[in-house]
Regions:
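Conserved N-terminal glycine/acidic-rich loop preference
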Residues: 2, 7-18, 40-54
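A short, basic/flexible loop-to-alpha-helix module at the beginning of a structural domain
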Residues: 1-6, 117-121
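Conserved N-terminal/central alpha/beta ligand/cofactor-binding core
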Residues: 36-134
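N-terminal Rossmann-like FAD-binding beta1-loop-alpha1 element of flavoenzymes
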Residues: 9-33
């Protein structure tokens, strides 16, 4: 039995990059996401840890870039690292708008004005890892 499907865009991969692309495409497009397995079986779903971003007033983009380059041991391209770090705060904001419930210092406080619970993890000189508690 053959089935013919028509889409404007075929996104190959259902990890963070593929799903982010699919969510950011114009809504009038017919989009299909192709995955080699169940969405809950991919690497992104099982990844532990959080997302690194400059969210603390004592942190800077330059410090984050330096930490990443040191941890990368020569494997990272500085211009790519800088571009990623410079846009990390807006990426976190986009995730919040998509409904990601990042952990806050005071879970009972209203979202507006409530600081996020940030941690310092391997390779980072400042608290910049934001998590969504399970």
């Amino acid at each position: 039995m053959s089935q013919h499907l028509q889409h404007d865009v075929l996104v190959i991969g259902s990890g963070a990059a593929g799903l982010t692309l699919a969510l950011n495409l114009p809504t009038h497009l017919r989009i299909a996401v192709l995955s080699k397995g169940d969405l809950a079986n991919g690497s992104t779903y099982w990844a532990q840890g959080g997302v690194a971003a400059v969210l603390d007033e004592d942190d800077t983009i330059d410090l984050h870039v330096d930490d990443t380059l040191k941890a990368g041991a020569g494997l990272c391209h500085e211009d790519t690292v800088r571009l990623t770090v410079e846009h990390s705060r807006e990426a976190i904001q986009w995730l919040i708008e998509q409904g990601v419930p990042f952990t806050r210092e005071d879970p009972d406080a209203p979202e507006t004005g409530c600081a996020f619970h940030l941690t310092r993890e391997g390779g980072h000189s400042h608290r910049r890892i934001i998590h969504a508690a399970d």
